[in-house]
């Protein structure tokens, strides 16, 4: 099911304060490096309504370039030709990555959501770094009601008891842990969009299994002492203790819950849905995370253990931490949409 969500869009041009002329502040933390990426980023800033056509044109160019290279392949490849082919393939991959990233950024722009900038030290007396706006409602609306219900459970898992405390309470956390939490939440958003699309399609086609609401969670509740943003714990779907069985009904009055649907799926299907499909997507998750939190300063000691003593600790509120998680989940959902759209125009996913 290919998302058709890249048509039109409102203009959200962000000019750096105190500057004049055509200098525009970055609308995303990752810098575009390829000529195609820089062109698309400029179009997104100044003429966002032209971006869909520009993306399609660039994907056509990539396909033509790939076809031309295939036709030019000699019967006996020498080392020089192989090297040239490898360089061209890397250039295509970088271009493809930045096309996907630009489509992700466009989704944030269309929903009037400002992406969180690089997390850096501030002059605030408390050391707070989370002075970005509260956009929880906007980030909620990019998901279906059923999906956001599961996102709230994800927040409860990764934040734990912090969810019940004042949102203005300041906590200290290392950048490495923040990066792990952010990257894991991207992967959760990717999985959630993928499985939600299947759920919504089956519900529309009235092909949902009759007994799927009777299934139980296959996973044990997470160990309270475990770091809950470990990717291994992300696809746990524990039932709520106060679950009243209410779901989202159809025209016939039948009640369905995405949570119950996920628990109904077999482990092989769950694993497949939780797997990132392309190396380009994996690379973008890494780049987005490092653009926000920097490259982790980790050293391997002689005994094989990891030394993270140089890891920087930052302060932020529970509200800011919540915004980080919600943005990451939205990023993952948009990543699935963008990857699927690009695949519909330029086949690059492995079967």
Predicted regions, residues:
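Long compositionally biased, domain-poor regions of proteins
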Residues: 17-351
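N-terminal chloroplast transit peptides
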Residues: 1-26
